[in-house]
Amino acid sequence: MAGEQNIKYFNIKGRMEAIRWLLAVAGVEFEEKFFETKEQLQKLKETVLLFQQVPMVEIDGMKLVQTRAILHYIAEKYNLLGKDMKEHAQIIMYSEGTMDLMELIMIYPFLKGEEKKQRLVEIANKAKGRYFPAFENVLKTHGQNFLVGNQLSMADVQLFEAILMVEEKVPDALSGFPLLQAFKTRISNIPTVKTFLAPGSKRKPVPDAKYVEDIIKIFYF
């Protein structure tokens, strides 16, 4: 088991969830420190946040900010970034695609009325019309159990997370994508993934009205 890491964020999914996933799948213990007030966040902004933004992860004597930088460091450290430069580039490419999809969903709870309805349609259309067909084809062409090479990578973890996020909004999103369905089953059976999916883990629940209220209070009141 790797050394414990310290992460600072809100007690929500947000941009930290991809980091939680990667640490958990790598089998890394991590401690969470949550912001519950605007004052707590402001204090950190004034002291250690390089760009006055979270998430932040304390790891190997560093205070890392910026989600992608954190993800790449964790992936490199725990052998989830491929065996050579070509695999590295492919993994980053696939990960960036899934991050684009996940960012569509992250903002969804904060929308209202017609804008929220339109965003749900956009999520469904882009998942089923752009991203899932692309990854279905990657799996078909590659012919392996994973997206790159034949071992688990950051790209697999993020695609799995993206699938779960989409299915929370569009339950039938994987219909018509048999290879992605099989991929989801394979990844869900990895022991560390099973553990993170189980009740009582540090995985955060689907955002609800309280989630939105808490974040608005911290940022705007």
From Swiss-Prot:
SS bond list: none
Oligomeric form and interacting partners: Homodimer or heterodimer of GSTA1 and GSTA2.
Organism: Antechinus stuartii (Brown marsupial mouse)
Identification of the protein by name: Glutathione S-transferase
Root EC class: transferase
Compartments reported by the entry: Cytoplasm
GO cellular component: cytoplasm
One Gene Ontology term from the biological process aspect of the record: glutathione metabolic process
Family to which the UniProt record says this protein belongs: Belongs to the GST superfamily. Alpha family.
InterPro entries documented for this protein: Glutathione-S-Trfase_C-like (IPR010987), Glutathione-S-Trfase_C_sf (IPR036282), Glutathione_S-Trfase (IPR040079), Glutathione_S-Trfase_N (IPR004045), GST_alpha (IPR003080), GST_C (IPR004046), GST_superfamily (IPR050213), Thioredoxin-like_sf (IPR036249)
Residue span, GST N-terminal domain: 3-82
Residues reported to bind glutathione: Y9, K45, Q53, V54, Q66, T67
Primary role: Glutathione S-transferase that catalyzes the nucleophilic attack of the sulfur atom of glutathione on the electrophilic groups of a wide range of exogenous and endogenous compounds. Involved in the formation of glutathione conjugates of both prostaglandin A2 (PGA2) and prostaglandin J2 (PGJ2). It also catalyzes the isomerization of D5-androstene-3,17-dione (AD) into D4-androstene-3,17-dione and may therefore play an important role in hormone biosynthesis.
N-acetylalanine modified-residue sites: A2
Transmembrane segments: none
